[in-house]
Amino acid sequence: MSALNSFNMYKSALILGSLLATAGAQQIGTYTAETHPSLSWSTCKSGGSCTTNSGAITLDANWRWVHGVNTSTNCYTGNTWNTAICDTDASCAQDCALDGADYSGTYGITTSGNSLRLNFVTGSNVGSRTYLMADNTHYQIFDLLNQEFTFTVDVSNLPCGLNGALYFVTMDADGGVSKYPNNKAGAQYGVGYCDSQCPRDLKFIAGQANVEGWTPSTNNSNTGIGNHGSCCAELDIWEANSISEALTPHPCDTPGLTVCTADDCGGTYSSNRYAGTCDPDGCDFNPYRLGVTDFYGSGKTVDTTKPFTVVTQFVTDDGTSSGSLSEIRRYYVQNGVVIPQPSSKISGISGNVINSDFCAAELSAFGETASFTNHGGLKNMGSALEAGMVLVMSLWDDYSVNMLWLDSTYPANETGTPGAARGSCPTTSGNPKTVESQSGSSYVVFSDIKVGPFNSTFSGGTSTGGSTTTTASGTTSTKASTTSTSSTSTGTGVAAHWGQCGGQGWTGPTTCASGTTCTVVNPYYSQCL
């Protein structure tokens, strides 16, 4: 995204809980038992057979009540630390405890089978951030290279200014317990968050508190920033409401969690956005921003008044899980029909997949800073996927720029500038106070999470001018995709090994390199195998 685009700015600064439930901690409290709501998800094999996994979710530590060890006195109230209990990073980590959560009563978080619902406003709590668990003390780790990740989402109750997000970050599986002696709570209590903005609003980072240098927010009564930030790679599979959506990878120099200090963090909280070790902007695919304004929304090709399924594929250069990430592909399934990601209509940007050519073209067409490339691009994003990533599901509003980066014109005074139009919401929309008071009953539902080889996690038909052709789930383990104009040829009009050689609407090479054959994978995609 552009240097001015703060689309991820306050993902890590969601409105944080009630006055008593607004912080993270390192020790474990005993006032409320921590019981993780169950959430099942599936692992699929080629051919379409899937196995159900018994998972659960936990609430991020920043939303929880933090109090003194063996006392109910708050360590943190509103947006201010209680320095009578802790006045240094070390003392807070040792003397403050993180307590269990009343998921439905306090936070409006409920699960049923494979479905998770996040309510926006519940009492005095606003928004939430949750993680998928492998067991009671570990986050579920996903390695998605040469795999597809699928989920169903209902965004029908997300108006302008809200973001129901599903994404991955390279957090420690145990939440840092094994690395930091003061961290007793760990993943069980939602400790260890990091992302590509290097958030400094976290109360605890890497076994220490973030109290030293803490500055309360001037426009948010629950948040502030400290001296330290928590950096790691971030893959935004889904940032969306009922108006707009975006798919955005954010690499870092080092994929795993690293701690930064003050303005050296870069990202949202620093005077120099690009001073840090991570890419705060990303290489985004927002159909509306790419000129396809009739694709996503109420009554459009993907109709956001109804649930739909989102399929994302992580293609490698050699077609194996040990290869390097070369493309990210996306399509949708709604009403039994597979819907391809639309191709860009912006001059100078072609195709409908995220690859190096697309990112370079978007950078040039929109006049953006080369942050994505400078931090390793898809290669480093692939390193994060190889390292394993944690699944995050959240609902938030934006105290920075009112979510205009997602669903409106941003910057608001740049109407007509290439890349500024991101959605149809007015530039006056998204003010958090208004959204919270007028749209407090909003919610998002994520369900039917699946992971597996290409074409194993979904089924559907393809619309072909009034008739529908059925595509079975899992008919092959090679990559399925939408129509694409990505560069997978050898430069001589011949598609390279693993490259695309055909499919509905394909205008690229149809002849394969010597030793490979153009093989039909599905109506949208044929591949040189």
Swiss-Prot record:
Regulation: Cellobiose inhibits xynA at high concentrations.
Residues in CBM1 domain copies: 493-529
EC numbers: 3.2.1.91
Molecular-function GO term, any one: cellulose 1,4-beta-cellobiosidase activity
Name used for this protein in its record: 1,4-beta-D-glucan cellobiohydrolase xynA
pH dependence (record): Optimum pH is 3.0-4.5.
Gene field: xynA
Organism whose genome encodes this protein: Talaromyces funiculosus
EC class name: hydrolase
